[in-house]
């Protein structure tokens, strides 16, 4: 999203650099005062949380060694069977570990076999297989290929919806079509093309006019374009549609309203209000990585580096216990690593030790395509 992808990759580092320069000037003038944000705080020494998390990962992997042997046997069975459900399950497990090339290999040659009484399950498998094949290129540094493949999945679902026999089958393919459309919009956002994303989000809003998520995503697209007024209108629409759901609204939907409010405040440089909104969103169980990352951004701009550090460290440490398909795994990103490196320079008594603890943890949990050049040496 706008703030998570842009602010964390450059703004935190630039703010920290300014603070570092200011400290150097203070020390050069003979004051040598340590700023309050430079002290180790009750949350724990910088890097300590990640050192603990690394130990937990090693212990878990030691227990999982036998399971890996079972996985290898499953892979052989999948290759022989070629059934979509088995291949999809195997690929998802590999993707959760960041083993994307192996996940792609698990899907190669997989096909859907038709059972006489199992057409609905076969349709689900067809869609899941196609969607995963469209997802994988993005993780293998082929963003354009992933976008094109997801567009093809959308076209397939639209065709099946038109040709389906029976209202139930037609509705099922429409749901899959809309899921593919959300995937296309998301890839346009990731590719810094919010205008193209809005075309798809507009179509989704017409197809599902009571779904708040489409208006929320449109608001973030407007933020990417610097259109605060457009974002405000979209976020207000999402909030009203969430309220209209009444008790049927989930905690996740209510949390998204608060996250949207935080994004709006952050982009408008209203940092205390942004922090309050993000904190409320996370209290509601908001799991989107952007909420925690953007809360860390707001904390930096609000002059609270220790809170920013604690948020980023906890986001990384949460990966240890995250489910295989959890959004929490997206927290492992070069921008988070770079920003923690910058923050450690000002908040750690021993920046080198804190960075080593983080690097050790990242090496244990990062996917195979992770850009290791972001790691401090």
Which residues are covered by each model-predicted region?
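"A position-specific structural signal for the A-helix of alpha-solenoid helical repeats
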Residues: 82-85, 89, 128, 132, ...
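Flexible helix-coil transition and linker loops at the boundaries of alpha-helical arrays
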Residues: 113-126, 156-175, 203-208, 241-251, ...
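Structured C-terminal portions of repeat-based eukaryotic scaffold domains
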Residues: 236-240, 246-377
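Start-of-helix signal in alpha-solenoid helical-repeat scaffolds, especially tetratricopeptide repeats
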Residues: 84, 120-123, 127, 171-178, ...
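Inward-facing hydrophobic residues that define packing positions of alpha-helical scaffold repeats
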Residues: 53, 79, 95, 100, ...
